[in-house]
Amino acid sequence: MKELYFITSNKGKLKEAKEKINHLDIEIIQLKLDYPEIQASDLKEIALYGLDFCSERFKSPFFLEDSGLFIEELNSFPGPYSRYVHETIGNDGILKLLLGASNRNAYFKSVIGLYNNGPIIFEGVSKGKISKEIRGKGGFGYDPIFMPENSEKTFGEMSTEEKNSYSHRGKALDNMVKYLENGVE
């Protein structure tokens, strides 16, 4: 079995990744390695910086993931600042910002950076809308307020398997899995 390190401290992200990759002969190992996250408006730029920084300190194959919630009514806010905004105002704060808003369209975007003899980027997008209230206790982050297209449930109301079928991270992981299935060393 090959080892592939996932640089994250987020157990929810780790669980999603393991479920997507479990059919491959690859062991996903969590690595809690702090790296600076540059302030940029582009998730791909942030991921590439993280890959470059971590590859200078860690020599085994690894991947990292950055994602953001982009809300149309708020001019794509919080976007790449999603983690900070969630830690600061949380889901309640986002719902307050959208009080009275008729446009609740939003999308999650995930960028996975894989480093294995060089950087490779995989992306995934999940379109949907922001619910009017917090619903569900599953998942993490904005999951209890994001409803993907073609679902009346929020990510917070879904099982991990169900969420993965809609998830931006799930789509980015699928793209990485297709790459890994081709036997890339």
Please give the residue ranges for each predicted region.
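Anionic-ligand binding patches
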Residues: K2-Y5, G12-E185
